[in-house]
Amino acid sequence: MLSIQVKDYMNHYPVTFTSEMVVEEAALRFLKTKQIGGPVIDGNNRVIGFLSESDVLATMLQTIYHNEHVSDVAALMRKEVLSVKPSDSVIELAKSMFQNKPKVYPVLDEDGILLG
């Protein structure tokens, strides 16, 4: 049976965020790209976290309600990132998606650099 790999179907231009980005800008990026999550990268394209649309919206609602300053992405991002390699099986990834909550998995090389 032919093995279908992640690299054959990954998005080569995923929506990304930086840790310094303000939450409002991240929310606009989610709206423009119609994505539900994306990796937070450093200046070397290394993944340092993950940001979900639901985390951004929940924070914005809370800060608006309490009339507080909205924080930056670094305060919201998840530091433990579930990721895949380009050579991973799409079938195995699909099984993981049924078992785990995330539906977006960054594709990383061996050095943690974002590929898709």
How should these model regions be labeled?
Residues 43-44, 55:
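Residues at secondary-structure transition points
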Residues 48-49, 116:
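Conserved glycine-centered beta-strand/turn positions repeated across beta-sheet architectures
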Residues 16-34, 41, 83-101, 107-110:
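The conserved cystathionine-beta-synthase
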Residues 16, 20, 46, 66-67:
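A generic helix-loop boundary/linker signal
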Residues 1-13, 52-102, 114:
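Tandem CBS (Bateman) regulatory domains
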Residues 37-39, 50:
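Short, conserved beta-strand segments within well-ordered enzyme catalytic domains
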